[in-house]
């Protein structure tokens, strides 16, 4: 499912899903990068106003955690090769949750490389592995990193509990250090069994 910023949904059901190996990797192409400036959905002043608004809401108790995000956008050339970008990401920034989707019939082309597994489902069992806390080494993690991870685990437990059998939700791992090229993340595992 792809959701635009405006809220439009595109759902794609694949007949088959195969893990990529050397034989399935996209062909090498010429990824030439993007030239010219990127656009941001927030100015610095708008971002700072958003931070102040969040602080007020946290102090008032109306929110627990907020991720203030902005959209970076760039005009794309007509001859853009998303598969080439996907291959470049795979070679230079290998990530456990990487992929390339080419579905031109519905206007979807995605190259992604993420260290985070938002949600997996195996039969009736679901697991989320949120990441909060990033440093160059595990020893450089700050108390703030552990506190943020515990906070997101609490939120994920609450969210999963809404659709899982009572008593089945648990934290299988808390604040596990997971190494990636050039950095370490704190990762926790939250799981439960879906209500049938």
Give residue ranges: language-model regions:
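Extended alpha-helical targeting/anchoring segments
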Residues: 1-196
